[in-house]
Amino acid sequence: MISRSDLPQLNATVLHEKRIPYEYLKVTPNSIKPIQSDRLPFDDNHYIRRYTKIVRDTYNPLIVDKDFNLIDGHHRYDIIRRMDPPMTSVRVLQLGISYETVIELFKK
């Protein structure tokens, strides 16, 4: 597991700026592998906002590496895993590189 402080905060804009190749996919939640060892706590209002975005399908896609290791979006993933009824697909941006390579790119 990787510490939250070692994982960069990513979105499509950052990926484009860093010229990191990615593609938009819909995948099953079970195909995603979380790699972050710790989470920042968040209050009920923050949880409700994220939950609402997930239910309305307006959430930012989760960011996964080439092997579906979750790089960004662990709180959203935690909420998605607790949904009842379960979600059958999740929006992701899949990178064409590994999470180790991503970490190295952002250390520079």
Language-model regions, residue ranges each:
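Short alpha-helix boundary/capping and kink motifs at helix termini
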Residues: E17-I71, H75-R81, T88
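Compositionally biased, intrinsically disordered low-complexity regions
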Residues: T13-V14, K33, S98
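Polar/charged alpha-helical tracts
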Residues: S5, E23, D67, E100-K107
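N-terminal leader/domain-start detector
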Residues: M1-E23
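Amphipathic, charge-rich alpha-helical segments that serve as recognition/docking helices
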Residues: Q36-F42, P85, S89-K108
